[in-house]
Amino acid sequence: MSTLAKIEALLFVRGEDWIRVRQLAELLSLPPTGIQQSLEKLSQKYEKDLDSSLDLIETGGAYRLVTKPQFSEILKEYSKAPINQSLSRPALETLSIIAYKQPITRIEIDAIRGVNSSGALAKLQAFDLIREDGKKEVLGRPNLYVTTDYFLDYMGINHLEELPVIDELEIQAQESQLFGERIEEDENQ
């Protein structure tokens, strides 16, 4: 098995996370200069191969595999359809809360929504829209949830600051309306 193939496999399993030359060198027990040369060869291979949809990008000494820009439209369509059809209203509510209040715990999300959010959190993690990001320094050390880079890509933004600004009073009004809808639903059952 070639060094190039090993590096490619590691880049593939790393997914959207960046990997540094130093990390690859440690994993493969090779000198960083050899890893750097292999990465350059791999990058050239992807550039020349017109039948490959992959590309290798580098930022600040870290690398990751991505799809070539010419595939962006088809990938946007693919990524939109299943999530739009599969995310329930509770999952969308949970995602919105995390996007605006992150980092946030499940208990804090539950308090805002008024119901248990475990199922919604699991679905959002499966879609790679959110991830665990450490523990809150309180009794029980609950997980903290944040949105992912994929969430930003999916929303078509580069930074969370680009999310629409929501007035705190508007949020409270929406929460009150949502709470009222739940009471009506409970009374009708």
Swiss-Prot record:
Q: Among its keywords, does the record have Nucleotide-binding?
A: no
Answer yes or no on keyword Cytoplasm: yes
Query: Sorted alphabetically, which Pfam families does this protein's record hold?
Result: SMC_ScpB
Q: Which UniProt keywords apply?
A: Cell cycle, Cell division, Chromosome partition, Cytoplasm
BP-aspect Gene Ontology terms: cell division; chromosome separation; DNA replication
Localisation:
Cytoplasm
Highest taxon above the source species: Bacteria
Task: Give the chief site where it resides.
Answer: cytoplasm
Recorded hits in InterPro entries, A to Z, give: ScpB_csome_segregation, WH-like_DNA-bd_sf, WH_DNA-bd_sf
Please name the SUPFAM superfamilies in this protein's record: Winged helix' DNA-binding domain
Q: Name one GO cellular component term.
A: cytoplasm
Checking PANTHER family in the record gives: SEGREGATION AND CONDENSATION PROTEIN B
Subunit notes for this chain? Homodimer. Homodimerization may be required to stabilize the binding of ScpA to the Smc head domains. Component of a cohesin-like complex composed of ScpA, ScpB and the Smc homodimer, in which ScpA and ScpB bind to the head domain of Smc. The presence of the three proteins is required for the association of the complex with DNA.
Family assignment?
Belongs to the ScpB family.
- Matching NCBIfam families: SMC-Scp complex subunit ScpB
- State the protein's purpose: Participates in chromosomal partition during cell division. May act via the formation of a condensin-like complex containing Smc and ScpA that pull DNA away from mid-cell into both cell halves.
Protein name, as recorded: Segregation and condensation protein B
